[in-house]
Design a protein with these regions (language model features):
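Patatin-like phospholipase
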Residues: 1-196
Length: 196
């Protein structure tokens, strides 16, 4: 008999043939299955757009229709993320604000929330220390707890906090949200929980 090896085992991203044929704009769909990824030399005038899941898709030989529908939905939203430059690691967030907006959102707390945070982090609650406590202690610790990179931005921190809270509130991730829409969804959910 003859031995046959699926091309995915030898080269699971067959990009080379498209580059060799002279295509300049290539959309690469990644599923991160078994196999190798062959190195391809890409010229500077070739644009590679990558759609890749941020979660594991599981085994390639699982044939579950419900999981397949979920993967199709995930692929659709990951494609929207790539095309429209959506932010977020879990959610699909359309944002366009400047860095100072996110800093303001992170430090603008009412007195009760500020007091709660200062108590949780065992910091002095003097009003004169407000800015320094938040920017030099609380926000860097939050970034570390959320496992952000060492050179995190206020935008990254705010979106990470927003996403972590949305996940805890079990808000559906399969929708494109603006920052305000996701924050409002969270507030609605939290208001509903506190009303019980």
């Amino acid at each position: 008999g003859k031995t046959y090896i699926d091309g995915g085992a030898i080269n699971n991203v067959p990009l080379g043939s498209l580059v060799e044929r002279g295509y300049k704009d290539i959309i690469m769909i990644r599923i991160f299955g078994v196999g190798r990824e062959k190195k391809v030399k890409i010229s500077e005038d070739t644009n590679i757009y990558t759609v890749a899941p941020k979660v594991s898709l599981g085994s390639i030989i699982e044939f579950d229709s419900r999981k397949t529908r979920t993967h199709l939905k995930l692929g659709y939203y990951d494609t929207l993320r790539m095309i429209y430059g959506l932010k977020g690691k879990i959610y699909y967030i359309d944002e366009s604000e400047e860095e100072c907006y996110y800093l303001n959102q992170l430090v603008k707390l009412n007195a009760e929330n500020y007091q709660h945070i200062m108590t949780a982090y065992k910091l002095p609650q003097a009003e004169s220390r407000y800015c320094r406590n938040m920017t030099e202690i609380v926000l860097p610790v939050m970034a570390e707890e959320l496992k952000l990179s060492k050179d995190w931005t206020y935008k990254e921190l705010y979106l990470a906090v927003l996403e972590a809270t949305a996940k805890l509130c079990r808000i559906s991730k399969y929708k494109v949200y603006t920052v305000d829409e996701l924050r409002e969804k969270i507030q609605e959910k939290l208001h509903g929980l506190s009303g019980r």
